[in-house]
Amino acid sequence: MILQAVVGGFVLDALFGDPAWLLHPVVLMGRCISRLEKFLRARLPGTPQGELLGGAVTAFCLPVGTFLVTSLVCLAAAKLSPWLGLAVQMFWCGQALAARGLAQESRNVYAQLIKNDLPAARKAVSRIVGRDTQDLTAEGVTKAAVETVAENASDGVIAPLLYMLIGGAPLALTYKAINTMDSMLGYKNEKYLYFGRAAAKLDDVANYIPSRLAALLWVATAAFTGNDAKGAWRIWRRDRRNHASPNSAQTESACAGALGVQLAGPAYYFGEYYPKPTIGDALRPIEPQDILRANRMMYVASGFALAWGAAIRGFLA
């Protein structure tokens, strides 16, 4: 049943994405994180030790709660009817994937750049990146969009695919809970330096293997999409550690090498300057069409992940 649910969920995401009218599990997770953080901060001392404890409790409760609730719902649905159980798993597998949404948002950035509407392009890219965008040049907007497609190809598409192939929708949504915690709490600023540490470390562990598999898939994908596979391999080997996170530069470096452009570098977050290292070599200037090229590689890489994962699961069954 798991394999059918994964394939069905993949198709659902490719066809429909995440409709705006439908409440997404990640939104519910975000609300739970905010309320749990508020509850714990009000009851624990505001010392580093108190914040570390609060963050650890959050990092334990949300993933465990997500797995238990979704597992119980899937089991109850399957007990009522195998078809209902499959439908629930398929629906949640589709919601755990973000390929179509990522492609739509990044293509909107591309559309504004092509129209030379820089303010609109900045606004569009601000929906999918965490950095400050109000002063970005057209090149900076393009770079930000390509980077987010490359990074989210791993944690928004390939990693959830791998987890759902192992444990169905419950494990995929548990991964999304971990990923959501990191995106909300995993900042190294005054507010979250201690409270967000457990969430950030847990996300590093959850993404360690998937991010590296995603990078290798991206290298393979470059050969099938008219990009530079040798360059992708070379830059991945050289620059995959050029990030504070052990995972974020994995697919970014493979993407930069495949396209022959330079990504990353210094950026502003919440008004604060971060002197981050660059990734890749600027063999040519980055251009809006690179957003479309990155999307194409993201789709092909996710297709490879599904096909190879399904084949391995079928072989082991």
Residue ranges and their predicted role:
Residues S183:
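Glycine-rich phosphate/dinucleotide-binding loop and adjoining beta-alpha-beta core of small-molecule
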Residues M1-T174, I178, G186-A317:
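Hydrophobic alpha-helical transmembrane segments
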